[in-house]
Amino acid sequence: MARYCGPKNRVARRFGANIFGRSRNPLLKKPHPPGQHGMQRKKKSDYGLQLEEKQKLKACYGMIMEKQLVKAFKEVIHKQGNVAQMFLERFECRLDNMVYRMGFAKTIFAAQQLVAHGHILVNGRRVDRRSFFLRPGMQISLKEKSKRLQSVKDALESKDESSLPSYISLDKTGFKGELLVSPEQDQIEAQLPLPINISVVCEFLSHRT
C-alpha cells in the first residue's frame, strides 16, 4: 500500500499543530509555517479553503492517500444518514487509528507500522491492512510475541486511560482493546489534534466523485 514518505515536521508546521503527537514538538524550534516567507500568506479562495480542510483531514489520520479519501466518500455518499459523520467514521475506525487511539503506539505512524508488520490481531486473527474498518464489538489485541516489544510497553505505560474516548475500551494488562460503539461526529472531532470542517471536505469531494 502506498504511503506518504515526505517531511512530517513540515506538515505539522504548515497547520500550526503537533498533529502527529511527536515527543519533540516541531513547533518549538520553528513555530512559523514552512518556506522563506512562511508568515506571509495570501487570503485563500473558497477552493483554497476547501483544499486546506481536506489536507488537514488526511494529515490527522496519518497522511492517508487521495484515492483512499475518495473511496471512503463514495462508500457513504448514497447512504441514508449524516454523510459527514459516516465519512469521518471511515477514518476514525480504521485499524491503524484504533491501534493509536488505544495506546499501543505513541504516534499514528508507529501504529501503521505495527499493523503492516503483522503484530495486530482483530478478533484473534492477524490483520495487516491498515485501512481495515472496525465495527462495534471488534476486539484488537497483540500477537503473543509482539507483547514483548519495548515500544508497545512504553506506549501503553504512558497512555492515560482517562483520555480514552468513550467508544473504546482498553485492557492494558491483557494487551487488548475493543471498539464498543460507533463514534458520533462530535466525539471524533474531540479527538482530532486540530479543528476540521468536515462538511467543507464533503462538499469538495462531492464535485469530484
Swiss-Prot record:
Q: Name one GO biological process term.
A: translation
* Sample GO molecular function, one term: rRNA binding
Q: InterPro entries recorded for this chain? A: Ribosomal_uS4 (IPR022801), Ribosomal_uS4_bac-type (IPR005709), Ribosomal_uS4_N (IPR001912), S4_RNA-bd (IPR002942), S4_RNA-bd_sf (IPR036986)
The record's listing under SUPFAM superfamilies reads:
Alpha-L RNA-binding motif
Cleaved signal peptide residues: none
Q: Where is the S4 RNA-binding domain?
A: 93-153
Q: How does it assemble?
A: Part of the 30S ribosomal subunit. Contacts protein S5. The interaction surface between S4 and S5 is involved in control of translational fidelity.
Put simply, this protein is called: Small ribosomal subunit protein uS4
Xref: PROSITE patterns: S4
Q: Native species of this protein?
A: Chlamydia pneumoniae
Asked if Secreted is a keyword of the record, the answer is no
> Which keywords fit this entry according to its UniProt record?
Ribonucleoprotein, Ribosomal protein, RNA-binding, rRNA-binding
Q: What family is this protein classified in?
A: Belongs to the universal ribosomal protein uS4 family.
Region annotated Disordered, chain positions = 23-46
For this record, the Gene Ontology CC terms, alphabetical, are: small ribosomal subunit
What is the annotated role of this protein in its UniProt record? One of the primary rRNA binding proteins, it binds directly to 16S rRNA where it nucleates assembly of the body of the 30S subunit. With S5 and S12 plays an important role in translational accuracy.
